[in-house]
C-alpha cells in the first residue's frame, strides 16, 4: 500500500479528528506529560500530530488502526481492550490519557460504524474507570446526559466539528 492510500485510509476513519481540524484544538489543551496514552486510536489523528512524549502508547482493540499507524516517532502499540490496559497500567501521575471511545449509539446518526461497538454499559464502565485514574485525561465525544451525569465534576469544553452528517458539537 502506498503512503497516499495509507494516509487517506487513516484520516477517513469515522469520528476522525483530522478532517475537521479538531486535532489542533485538542492538542493545544494538553497539559505537560511524560507518558502519552491514547485509547480507541481509530485513525490516529491525534497521536500522529501531537509532539511526542518521552513514552507514547496507543491502544485499540481493533488491529486495523494499529497496522495502519505510520507516525513519525516510536509508539508502543497495544492490541487490547482499553478498559483492561488502563486498569492494569502502573501510573506515576505524569501520564496524559486521550480517550475517544465509540460514540454513544443513541446520539449518532448511523448505528453501524464501528467494527468493535460499545454498549451503554461499556461507556459506564469506561467513565467509571477514567474517574478513578491518578492522571490527566482528555475525553472526546458528543454531548449526552449519560456523560454529563457521570462526569458532572469534570471540566467540559464544547468545540464545533464538521462531520459527514454536518456540523456537530464535540464535548
Report each predicted region and the residues it spans.
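Class I S-adenosyl-L-methionine-dependent methyltransferase catalytic core
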Residues: 1-171
